[in-house]
Design a protein with these regions (language model features):
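Non-heme di-metal
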Residues: 1-319
């Protein structure tokens, strides 16, 4: 049997500068959940009602499911269609960070929650029809044979589907609750923003190579898929937030991020401004300059603890 030749990646010869730009951004943003002092949120966690605690665990379990999908199936499914080896490398980084995100929710659970309650949330995630439905919609395109539809599905997952869950920790943070957990979620959101942007960029680059007619078909497909996901997400939001008065605010946040997902694909917004009007407190909590003082671009912040190496000389140790 003749083996195919393997080419070594050469980062000194790059055909698309965006690959290196995004690689540098992702690696400079690298973080781990162990560096965030989640235990500082234990007192705040204990002030939440039983309903709020259960909601939080279900939200984070749903997000874990989506991260698992993106880590195990999503990003790897995009690799065979990569145009450059550098694009493959970026996608491998994306896949790994999705595993870090999934690990992060387990860190929250082990720090704040009782095992029996977490187990109940995981059982809920396997039986919740809208949650399983959105994973199935995305997965069927990942397992398909159309590279551009895979990218559309990936952008909708990264830039839209996570946000019915992301709303809750931002809401708590805006009220001074679970602020360290919110810091961790901001790190995840920062990553997802880069992922959605990059995969959307690659989608648009690939569109340049096909006919106008095919572009029109893909645009129609994208809008139809988004509407299908949106209808399902409304049902998911209603079920998830049923015992709270927050569902309408979450739905506005969904519209806001659905429009952003379309922008990542190069398309115009679908939802009018009045449907996508997000509570300013939530947008402020999302900001890199929120109360937790996170620096989205260096990976540092009031809650993220990382040691720094400083060169010393022998005389520095003469106490």
């Amino acid at each position: 049997m003749k083996l195919s030749r393997i080419s070594a990646i050469n980062w000194n010869k790059i055909s698309d500068d965006k690959d290196l730009e995004v690689w540098n951004r992702l690696t400079s943003n690298f973080w781990l959940p162990e560096k965030v002092p989640l235990s500082n949120d234990i007192p705040a966690w204990q002030t939440l009602s039983v309903v709020e605690q259960q909601l939080t665990m279900r939200v984070f379990t749903g997000l874990t499911l989506l991260d698992t999908l993106q880590n195990v199936i999503g990003a790897p499914s995009l690799m065979p269609d990569a145009i450059t080896p550098h694009e493959e490398a970026v996608l491998s980084n994306i896949s790994f960070m999705e595993a870090v995100h999934a690990r992060s929710y387990s860190s929250i659970f082990s720090t704040l929650c009782q095992t029996k309650d977490v187990d109940a949330a995981y059982a809920w995630s396997e039986e919740n029809a809208p949650l399983q439905r959105k994973a199935q919609i995305i997965q069927q395109h990942y397992r398909g044979d159309n590279p551009l539809k895979k990218k559309i599905a990936s952008v909708f997952l990264e830039s839209f589907l996570f946000y019915s869950g992301f709303w809750l920790p931002m809401y708590f943070s805006s009220r001074g609750k679970l602020t360290n957990t919110a810091d961790l979620i901001r790190l995840i959101i920062r990553d997802e923003a880069v992922h959605g942007y990059y995969i959307g960029y690659k989608y648009q680059k690939n569109l340049e190579k096909i006919s106008q007619a095919r572009r029109g078909e893909l645009k129609s497909f994208a809008f139809d898929m988004l509407l299908e996901l949106y209808d399902n997400e409304l049902q998911y939001t209603d079920e998830l937030y049923a015992e709270t008065p927050w569902a309408d605010d979450v739905k506005a946040f969904l519209c806001y991020n659905a429009n952003k997902a379309l922008m990542n694909l190069g398309y115009e917004p679908l939802f009018p401004a009045e449907m996508a009007e997000v509570n300013p407190a939530i947008l402020a909590a999302l900001s890199p300059n929120a109360d937790e003082n996170h620096d989205f671009f260096s990976g540092s912040g009031s809650s993220y603890v990382m040691g720094k190496a400083v060169e010393t000389e022998d005389e520095d140790w003469n106490f």
